[in-house]
Amino acid sequence: MTERTINAERVEQLIDVFGSFDENIRKIEDAFGVRITNRNNELKVSGDEEAADKGCRAIEALLALAAKGEEIDEQKVRYLINLVNTGNEDQVSKIAKDVVCVTAKGRPVKAKTIGQQNYLKAIEKNTITIGVAPAGTGKTYLAVAEAVAAFRAKTVNRIILTRPAVEAGERLGFLPGDLQNKVDPYLRPLYDALFDMLGPETYGKYLERGNIEVAPLAYMRGRTLDDSFIILDEAQNTTREQMKMFLTRLGFGSKIVITGDITQIDLPGDKVSGLKEAIRVLDGVEDIQICRLTPADVVRHVLVQRIVAAYDKYEKSRLPDDHARKFTQKPQTKRNLK
């Protein structure tokens, strides 16, 4: 059993570190199997040597954040625990505090993980950014935040949000209602992000003026989009032809962000994902950056992170079996019918 001692500069810092009902400290205790006690400004961390060392590093990182006046919430503590487990806890203080934009309710939007920070930097630096990430990493929300920031700064005149309107085998023509009714369910996540950033009234005003356009991917064909911030969401469900068509819509003064999750492809088995192909074809092309986020960047409920990690592990273990099955299956022979 090892016991380590940490001294805080002020009691107020410990209040922030411990969190409401000591929930932050309990998370650290559970994660590393240690016991943490305090008296005045002094903290004691008890456990086996490696566990006590990790617990101390986590607390010291939280104290450093508290000293800077940083807000310490559940997501930040969970992310810090992941960083400590990989020996990268120093990175938590390197997450840029730059605000991308402010929502309609006055909430600042900024990176919460190193992966998100690199993603935002890629968008700001490059004309085309491809964000490949699992669910819950904020890839679409942050892209919309960058689009709103660019529009407010008058570096673009329009925000165009699009996604494939055909998913899970459904065709628009078979769905009830007019065109708007047909596409609304597919585009709802994009509407939600814009409503959050702008508020419904401002969104409606810009939509009426043509400053904002939310449309199915098919509506991009034959157009050249100048001075626009264009986001293609759910890009894993584009075909290779759709992806090439979309990329060639780029006009002068425009910026493109493509987001998708290659583990959630809904295309028929004989169709190649345009996103997967674009990643291979465009890797290394100047002014195009491919940015990959991981389960560590998931900022939703902690269970979402576990679900994403579990599916990721399952998919990796399944690949060798699928590959072997492909070459061991006997080809089917056609019977001659008379």
Describe these PLM feature segments.
Residues 17, 24, 55-58, 243:
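Hydrophobic side chains in well-ordered alpha-helices
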Residues 26, 32-35, 41:
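Compact, well-ordered interaction domains used in eukaryotic information-processing assemblies
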Residues 42, 104-116, 122-232, 236-338:
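Conserved helicase motor core of SF1/SF2 NTP-dependent helicases
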Residues 86-107, 111-114:
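Conserved loop-to-helix interface motifs that mediate assembly, gating, or partner/ligand docking
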